[in-house]
Amino acid sequence: MAFFTIHPREMEKIILNKHALVLDVRERESYREGHFRGAYCCPYEEIDGWMRHFNRNRTLLVYCEYGSTSLLAARQLSKCGYEVYTVVGGMQAIRRYNGYD
């Protein structure tokens, strides 16, 4: 299955229309410092262990700090059969889109 890149403005639509599970693939400390509402902390290094808990019929939306780690996660998850969306620019872009610097 393929993965798709989206911009922060498209996140709500994917979450609502696809009932996507939102995964923050940054380190736990970064997650604790702030994350997208409703996102689960799923550090990239632990993604193999987490995959068995995800329903393959559920759409996943992943993000990291800048967008590069979430691309790796999206690639890995899509190879395992998940429909995955990743946010271009990561949490930095999400913050800018929502008016935070």
Predicted regions and their residues:
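Rhodanese-like catalytic fold shared by cysteine-dependent sulfurtransferases
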Residues: 1-21, 28-59, 68-101
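Short, surface-exposed ligand- or partner-binding patches at beta-edge/loop junctions that are enriched
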Residues: 63-64
